[in-house]
Design a protein with these regions (language model features):
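Alpha/beta-hydrolase-fold serine-hydrolase catalytic core, especially in secreted/extracellular enzymes
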Residues: 2-170
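Start-of-helix register in tetratricopeptide repeats
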Residues: 26, 150, 184, 218-219
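Canonical positions in the second alpha-helix
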Residues: 51, 174-175, 208-209
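TPR alpha-solenoid repeat register
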Residues: 60-64, 185, 219
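Canonical tetratricopeptide repeat
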Residues: 64-67, 188, 222-223
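TPR/Sel1-like alpha-solenoid repeat signature
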Residues: 159, 171, 186-193, 205
Length: 243
Protein backbone atom coordinates (compact mmCIF):
# COMPACT_ATOMS: atom_id res chain seq x y z
CA UNK A 1 0.00 0.00 0.00
CA UNK A 2 2.80 2.42 0.88
CA UNK A 3 4.56 1.70 -2.42
CA UNK A 4 1.32 2.33 -4.35
CA UNK A 5 0.87 5.65 -2.57
CA UNK A 6 4.38 6.70 -3.52
CA UNK A 7 3.86 5.74 -7.16
CA UNK A 8 0.55 7.63 -7.22
CA UNK A 9 2.31 10.74 -5.90
CA UNK A 10 5.18 10.26 -8.34
CA UNK A 11 2.74 10.10 -11.28
CA UNK A 12 0.71 13.04 -10.07
CA UNK A 13 -2.37 10.97 -9.28
CA UNK A 14 -2.25 11.92 -5.62
CA UNK A 15 -1.25 15.10 -3.88
CA UNK A 16 2.26 14.89 -2.49
CA UNK A 17 2.61 14.50 1.26
CA UNK A 18 6.18 15.56 2.17
CA UNK A 19 5.90 14.25 5.71
CA UNK A 20 4.78 10.81 4.54
CA UNK A 21 7.46 10.71 1.85
CA UNK A 22 10.19 11.58 4.36
CA UNK A 23 8.96 8.92 6.80
CA UNK A 24 8.74 6.18 4.17
CA UNK A 25 12.13 7.06 2.73
CA UNK A 26 13.77 6.91 6.15
CA UNK A 27 12.08 3.59 6.91
CA UNK A 28 13.08 2.01 3.59
CA UNK A 29 16.66 3.25 3.92
CA UNK A 30 16.92 1.85 7.45
CA UNK A 31 15.56 -1.53 6.29
CA UNK A 32 18.10 -1.74 3.48
CA UNK A 33 20.98 -0.83 5.78
CA UNK A 34 19.84 -3.44 8.30
CA UNK A 35 19.83 -6.10 5.57
CA UNK A 36 23.35 -5.11 4.59
CA UNK A 37 24.51 -5.22 8.21
CA UNK A 38 23.06 -8.74 8.50
CA UNK A 39 25.09 -9.84 5.48
CA UNK A 40 22.27 -9.85 2.89
CA UNK A 41 24.10 -7.43 0.63
CA UNK A 42 22.52 -8.53 -2.65
CA UNK A 43 19.03 -7.95 -1.31
CA UNK A 44 20.08 -4.68 0.32
CA UNK A 45 21.59 -3.33 -2.90
CA UNK A 46 18.50 -4.33 -4.87
CA UNK A 47 16.24 -2.57 -2.36
CA UNK A 48 18.36 0.57 -2.55
CA UNK A 49 18.26 0.62 -6.36
CA UNK A 50 14.50 0.19 -6.19
CA UNK A 51 14.38 3.15 -3.82
CA UNK A 52 16.17 5.27 -6.40
CA UNK A 53 13.44 4.55 -8.93
CA UNK A 54 10.55 4.82 -6.49
CA UNK A 55 11.59 8.09 -4.86
CA UNK A 56 12.97 9.82 -7.94
CA UNK A 57 11.30 13.21 -8.20
CA UNK A 58 9.82 12.83 -4.73
CA UNK A 59 12.86 12.90 -2.45
CA UNK A 60 16.61 13.39 -2.54
CA UNK A 61 17.84 9.90 -3.45
CA UNK A 62 21.56 10.52 -2.96
CA UNK A 63 21.70 8.61 0.35
CA UNK A 64 20.17 5.50 -1.27
CA UNK A 65 22.44 5.78 -4.31
CA UNK A 66 25.58 6.21 -2.24
CA UNK A 67 24.67 3.28 0.01
CA UNK A 68 24.04 1.07 -3.03
CA UNK A 69 27.33 2.13 -4.65
CA UNK A 70 29.20 1.41 -1.44
CA UNK A 71 27.67 -2.07 -1.08
CA UNK A 72 28.20 -3.00 -4.74
CA UNK A 73 31.88 -2.06 -4.57
CA UNK A 74 32.52 -4.48 -1.71
CA UNK A 75 33.98 -7.97 -1.83
CA UNK A 76 30.98 -9.55 -0.11
CA UNK A 77 28.63 -8.23 -2.80
CA UNK A 78 30.85 -9.58 -5.59
CA UNK A 79 31.10 -12.95 -3.86
CA UNK A 80 27.35 -13.24 -3.33
CA UNK A 81 26.65 -12.13 -6.90
CA UNK A 82 28.96 -14.84 -8.20
CA UNK A 83 27.25 -17.40 -5.96
CA UNK A 84 23.86 -16.27 -7.25
CA UNK A 85 24.95 -16.68 -10.86
CA UNK A 86 26.24 -20.19 -10.15
CA UNK A 87 23.00 -21.07 -8.39
CA UNK A 88 20.90 -19.76 -11.28
CA UNK A 89 22.93 -21.81 -13.76
CA UNK A 90 22.57 -24.87 -11.51
CA UNK A 91 18.81 -24.35 -11.31
CA UNK A 92 18.52 -23.95 -15.08
CA UNK A 93 20.41 -27.21 -15.66
CA UNK A 94 18.27 -28.96 -13.07
CA UNK A 95 14.99 -27.83 -14.63
CA UNK A 96 16.19 -28.75 -18.10
CA UNK A 97 17.08 -32.24 -16.86
CA UNK A 98 13.71 -32.59 -15.16
CA UNK A 99 11.86 -31.62 -18.33
CA UNK A 100 13.84 -34.16 -20.34
CA UNK A 101 13.42 -37.05 -17.92
CA UNK A 102 9.77 -36.38 -17.16
CA UNK A 103 9.02 -36.28 -20.88
CA UNK A 104 10.10 -39.93 -20.96
CA UNK A 105 7.58 -40.75 -18.23
CA UNK A 106 4.81 -38.88 -20.04
CA UNK A 107 5.46 -40.46 -23.44
CA UNK A 108 6.06 -44.07 -22.40
CA UNK A 109 3.43 -46.79 -22.56
CA UNK A 110 5.43 -48.70 -19.95
CA UNK A 111 7.09 -46.24 -17.55
CA UNK A 112 10.74 -46.67 -16.54
CA UNK A 113 11.34 -48.12 -13.07
CA UNK A 114 10.87 -45.60 -10.29
CA UNK A 115 14.41 -46.03 -8.94
CA UNK A 116 15.84 -45.40 -12.41
CA UNK A 117 13.98 -42.13 -12.81
CA UNK A 118 14.86 -41.12 -9.25
CA UNK A 119 18.51 -41.51 -10.19
CA UNK A 120 18.34 -39.57 -13.44
CA UNK A 121 16.29 -36.83 -11.75
CA UNK A 122 19.00 -36.72 -9.05
CA UNK A 123 16.44 -36.52 -6.25
CA UNK A 124 18.94 -37.61 -3.60
CA UNK A 125 21.51 -35.02 -4.69
CA UNK A 126 18.89 -32.28 -4.81
CA UNK A 127 17.68 -33.15 -1.32
CA UNK A 128 21.23 -33.02 0.00
CA UNK A 129 21.94 -29.71 -1.75
CA UNK A 130 18.66 -28.19 -0.56
CA UNK A 131 19.94 -28.47 3.00
CA UNK A 132 22.92 -26.22 2.22
CA UNK A 133 22.84 -22.55 3.23
CA UNK A 134 22.84 -19.80 0.67
CA UNK A 135 21.80 -19.54 -2.95
CA UNK A 136 22.73 -23.10 -3.94
CA UNK A 137 20.44 -24.52 -1.28
CA UNK A 138 17.60 -22.22 -2.32
CA UNK A 139 18.05 -23.19 -5.98
CA UNK A 140 17.96 -26.89 -5.14
CA UNK A 141 14.84 -26.38 -3.02
CA UNK A 142 13.11 -24.57 -5.88
CA UNK A 143 13.97 -27.48 -8.18
CA UNK A 144 12.50 -29.92 -5.68
CA UNK A 145 9.35 -27.82 -5.29
CA UNK A 146 8.86 -27.74 -9.04
CA UNK A 147 9.43 -31.47 -9.33
CA UNK A 148 7.06 -32.25 -6.47
CA UNK A 149 4.17 -30.19 -7.80
CA UNK A 150 4.55 -31.79 -11.22
CA UNK A 151 4.65 -35.35 -9.87
CA UNK A 152 2.11 -35.07 -7.07
CA UNK A 153 -0.51 -32.96 -8.84
CA UNK A 154 -0.16 -32.05 -12.52
CA UNK A 155 0.85 -35.39 -14.05
CA UNK A 156 -1.83 -37.38 -12.17
CA UNK A 157 -4.41 -34.76 -13.11
CA UNK A 158 -3.75 -35.50 -16.78
CA UNK A 159 -3.03 -39.23 -16.59
CA UNK A 160 -5.74 -40.48 -14.22
CA UNK A 161 -8.66 -39.75 -16.59
CA UNK A 162 -6.75 -41.68 -19.27
CA UNK A 163 -6.36 -44.63 -16.88
CA UNK A 164 -2.57 -44.48 -17.19
CA UNK A 165 -2.30 -45.98 -13.73
CA UNK A 166 1.25 -47.28 -14.09
CA UNK A 167 2.49 -43.80 -14.98
CA UNK A 168 0.51 -42.26 -12.12
CA UNK A 169 1.95 -44.77 -9.65
CA UNK A 170 5.48 -43.86 -10.70
CA UNK A 171 4.62 -40.16 -10.39
CA UNK A 172 3.37 -40.60 -6.83
CA UNK A 173 6.30 -42.84 -5.88
CA UNK A 174 8.76 -40.22 -7.10
CA UNK A 175 6.81 -37.46 -5.35
CA UNK A 176 7.11 -39.38 -2.08
CA UNK A 177 10.87 -39.53 -2.56
CA UNK A 178 10.91 -35.75 -2.69
CA UNK A 179 8.58 -35.31 0.27
CA UNK A 180 7.10 -38.26 2.12
CA UNK A 181 4.74 -36.59 4.60
CA UNK A 182 1.67 -35.85 2.46
CA UNK A 183 -1.12 -38.26 3.46
CA UNK A 184 -3.19 -37.52 0.35
CA UNK A 185 -0.35 -38.50 -1.98
CA UNK A 186 0.13 -41.75 -0.06
CA UNK A 187 -3.61 -42.44 -0.22
CA UNK A 188 -3.73 -41.75 -3.95
CA UNK A 189 -0.74 -44.04 -4.45
CA UNK A 190 -2.58 -46.79 -2.54
CA UNK A 191 -5.55 -46.37 -4.87
CA UNK A 192 -3.59 -46.61 -8.12
CA UNK A 193 -1.57 -49.55 -6.83
CA UNK A 194 -4.82 -51.33 -5.98
CA UNK A 195 -6.14 -50.59 -9.46
CA UNK A 196 -2.95 -52.08 -10.90
CA UNK A 197 -3.37 -55.23 -8.82
CA UNK A 198 -0.36 -54.42 -6.63
CA UNK A 199 -2.31 -55.20 -3.49
CA UNK A 200 0.55 -55.66 -1.02
CA UNK A 201 2.10 -52.38 -2.13
CA UNK A 202 -1.31 -50.72 -1.98
CA UNK A 203 -1.82 -51.72 1.65
CA UNK A 204 1.66 -50.48 2.54
CA UNK A 205 0.92 -47.11 0.92
CA UNK A 206 -2.41 -46.91 2.71
CA UNK A 207 -0.67 -47.59 6.02
CA UNK A 208 1.65 -44.65 5.32
CA UNK A 209 -1.34 -42.45 4.50
CA UNK A 210 -2.93 -43.29 7.85
CA UNK A 211 0.37 -42.84 9.63
CA UNK A 212 0.59 -39.30 8.27
CA UNK A 213 -2.94 -38.42 9.30
CA UNK A 214 -5.30 -39.39 6.49
CA UNK A 215 -8.71 -39.49 8.19
CA UNK A 216 -11.45 -39.32 5.55
CA UNK A 217 -13.62 -42.10 6.96
CA UNK A 218 -16.25 -41.87 4.24
CA UNK A 219 -13.70 -42.21 1.46
CA UNK A 220 -11.98 -45.13 3.17
CA UNK A 221 -15.32 -46.90 3.48
CA UNK A 222 -16.70 -46.21 0.00
CA UNK A 223 -13.84 -45.57 -2.44
CA UNK A 224 -14.24 -48.12 -5.23
CA UNK A 225 -10.52 -47.90 -5.98
CA UNK A 226 -9.88 -49.82 -2.76
CA UNK A 227 -12.53 -52.50 -3.28
CA UNK A 228 -9.95 -55.13 -4.25
CA UNK A 229 -8.37 -54.74 -0.79
CA UNK A 230 -11.43 -54.90 1.43
CA UNK A 231 -11.41 -58.67 2.02
CA UNK A 232 -7.72 -58.75 2.93
CA UNK A 233 -6.86 -59.25 6.57
CA UNK A 234 -4.10 -56.62 6.53
CA UNK A 235 -6.59 -54.06 5.18
CA UNK A 236 -9.12 -54.98 7.86
CA UNK A 237 -6.45 -54.64 10.53
CA UNK A 238 -5.54 -51.18 9.24
CA UNK A 239 -9.16 -50.08 9.37
CA UNK A 240 -9.65 -51.54 12.85
CA UNK A 241 -6.55 -49.85 14.24
CA UNK A 242 -7.39 -46.49 12.73
CA UNK A 243 -7.98 -43.76 15.35
Amino acid sequence: VEWMELIAMQRGKRERDPGLIDALYAKDLARAKMLAAEGHVLVAARRLREMERTYEGLHDISAAREAADRIESGDRFRTQKKQLRRAMAYEARCLERQNSELAILRSSDVPPPTHQLAGTLQIRNLTRNAAKPGEEGLAAQRCLNSLYSTLAFYFPLVDLPKKRYAQVAVSYELANMVRDDNPVVWYNLACVRALLGRKNDAVRALARALEHGFNNSELLATDADLDSLRKREDFKVLMAERP
